[in-house]
Amino acid sequence: MRAIGVNSYGGPDALEVVELPEPHAGRGEVRLRVRAAAVNPTDTLVRNGARAEHQRKDPPPYVPGMDAAGEVDEIGEGTDTELHVGDAAMAIVVPDGSHGAYAEHVVVPAASVVRAPAGVSA
């Protein structure tokens, strides 16, 4: 899976295309096929290293992205949600490790994703 991440902290020029394993939804989780990701001020702090002490200690790359919009394409077994595969949805993503929204797919807790309002597209 392609994502935009950083292998070393810095300015916008530190962002690069990275390859990551495709994530899958587990129990209590929903996976989105990301169509849009906002640039949240927190994403800048992840990119420049200001949040390094608060991030998981996984090795880089770090993938920013707190806000995502797209389509639900996988729901973890036993997940309690009103969402269905194919629904347009929006999510708040906690950017720990490589789980930010600047990626082709993102997995989030079901409680962090909602159906997009009618007429809204990513």
PLM region spans:
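Extracytoplasmic/periplasmic beta-strand context in beta-sandwich domains
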Residues: 18, 87, 103-104
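Glycine-rich beta-strand-centered segment in the early N-terminal region that forms part
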Residues: 21-38, 51-95
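Cytochrome P450 core scaffold surrounding the K-helix E-X-X-R motif
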Residues: 42-48
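NAD(P)H dinucleotide-binding glycine-rich loop of Rossmann-like/cofactor-binding domains
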Residues: 57, 66, 92-122
